């Protein structure tokens, strides 16, 4: 699990940035925790915003291909396995088949599929994400597409090989490429939902995104509070001990 996600799940500490542990208290059942936070997220658009106030929240709501465990090691998340070509240019990820998208009410919307990663990257490029610099020169064809020299996104080095296999082709070998997959710029998004929300996708409204992670954001009131509840249908729910987290400004 990612460090902040793992800490939320175990209730030991809530990570730096949004989650501050000093003022925390637990209920007698130890499944509800209350803390304070210092800064409101000004967006939930995890694909275009490169700010800690967004990523500290999103990391507990949306999963990517890989994540860091409590020791900083890269471990599987949505990708249950992966391979790297001999020349170090092609990374192929096999997705778990039990990961689902849920709306803010916890209702299942769709399965998480390889095309969601392709859709996410195209959106990142089209919207000129704040975090593009992390990957623009890494993925084959992405720089040309972003600059407008290439109009066909299918020429960019990402593809859904099948429903549960996504593949990235790099411009050069990057031994640290897998670490980049933990950044929300490479997270998936459901295309149908994205289109339905339009410019409202990722606004400061819990219903503006879909969830595939351990928590759902039940409420967010500026300079007041944020409330998270456990996603009861999360594929790794047995490792999430907290049922409810309330952060107070």
Where are these regions (language model features)?
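Sec-exported extracytoplasmic/periplasmic mature domains
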Residues: 66, 70, 97-100, 122-129, ...
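Short, well-ordered beta-strand elements
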Residues: 29-39, 90-94, 117-120, 166-167, ...
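N-terminal lobe/hinge region of extracytoplasmic solute-binding protein
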Residues: 36-86, 210
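Bacterial signal peptide processing site
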Residues: 24-26
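Bacterial N-terminal signal peptides that target proteins for export
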Residues: 1-8
């Amino acid at each position: 699990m990612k460090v902040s996600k793992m800490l939320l799940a175990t209730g030991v500490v809530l990570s730096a940035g949004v989650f501050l542990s000093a003022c925390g208290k637990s209920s007698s059942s130890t499944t509800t925790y209350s803390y304070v936070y210092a800064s409101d997220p000004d967006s939930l658009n995890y694909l275009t915003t490169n700010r800690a106030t967004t990523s500290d929240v999103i990391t507990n709501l949306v999963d990517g291909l890989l994540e860091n465990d409590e020791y900083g090691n890269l471990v599987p998340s949505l990708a249950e396995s992966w391979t790297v070509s001999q020349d170090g240019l092609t990374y192929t990820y096999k997705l778990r088949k039990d990961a689902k998208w849920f709306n803010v009410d916890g209702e299942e919307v769709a399965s998480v599929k390889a095309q969601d990663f392709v859709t996410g990257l195209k959106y990142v490029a089209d919207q000129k994400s704040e975090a593009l610099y992390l990957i623009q020169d890494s993925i084959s064809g992405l720089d040309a597409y972003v600059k407008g020299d290439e109009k066909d996104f299918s020429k960019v080095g990402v593809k859904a090989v099948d429903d549960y296999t996504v593949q990235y082709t790099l411009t050069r070998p990057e031994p640290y490429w897998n670490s980049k997959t933990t950044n929300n710029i490479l997270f998936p998004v459901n295309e149908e939902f994205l289109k339905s929300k339009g410019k409202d996708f990722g606004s400061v409204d819990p219903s503006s995104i879909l969830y595939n992670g351990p928590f759902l954001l039940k409420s967010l009131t500026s300079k007041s509070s944020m409330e998270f509840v456990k996603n009861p249908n999360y594929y790794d729910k047995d490792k999430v001990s907290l049922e409810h987290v309330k952060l107070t400004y």
